[in-house]
Each structure stands twice: as C-alpha cells, then as structure tokens.
C-alpha cells in the first residue's frame, strides 16, 4: 500500500480549494447586482443562447448549456421571471417545453454581470494565464456548450 500524498500535493484537494476561492470571489462580485452565482450562470446562458442561436432556447437547452440540473434550472428561471429578468413561454415546436428569453432589463443585467465576472476571471486566473487555464480546464471537463441543440 502506498502512502497518501501530502495535502499540498493532492490534486483533488487543491482543485477543491481553488474552486472555493473562485466561487467566493464570484459570489462577492455578484452580490451588488443582487444575483446568486447560479442565477448569473442561467441568466448569462439564456442571454448568450438568445444572441447566438437561431431559435429561442428552451429550459432544457439552457440547462444543457450551463451544465445544470433541469429541475433546478426551471426553479431558478422561475425566480428570474418573477424579478422581470426573463420571460418563459410555451415553445412553438414542443408544447411540453418552455422557451426562455431575457427581458430588456435582464439583457442589461446579463451584460453587466458578464463584464463583472470576466474581470474576476481575468484577475483570478492571471497567475497561470488565461490560455493555460482554459486549456487545462477544457481537458478536465470538456465544454458541453459546444454540443448541438436538442429538439426538446
């Protein structure tokens, strides 16, 4: 049986610590915008998909893009809808699905929040450089947002 790694050399523990530090920085930066981290991710994903795909995204497409659970995505989108940041409507293709789009105020907030988060990311990942950070993270967790949109 081999000896376990010292904590300073444990990749899992190091990743855990880095993730917590990054999440704390993001959470603090989003607080003045009255957004939680998950609300930001889903609002920004909705905005990005609306801007970059030919049809309004469904809740399922947003969940797939963000890598979030479908049920949790639905709950968070409902909360964003209650705040007037997104509109959810029956999907014209699939009556079971809901299409989502940001409202004008949701789009403004998404743009502002993305700029805030990108600034945090720039500073946070500066010690290793953005390209190296993206290369490593892409190898560890392939970008699911590049998957093709689902029909549902």
Roles of regions detected by a PLM:
Residues 51, 78-138:
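Charged, amphipathic alpha-helical coiled-coil/dimerization segments
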Residues 20, 24-69:
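N-terminal helix-turn-helix DNA-binding core of bacterial DNA-binding proteins
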Residues 1-33, 131, 152:
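N-terminal leader segment of winged-helix/HTH proteins
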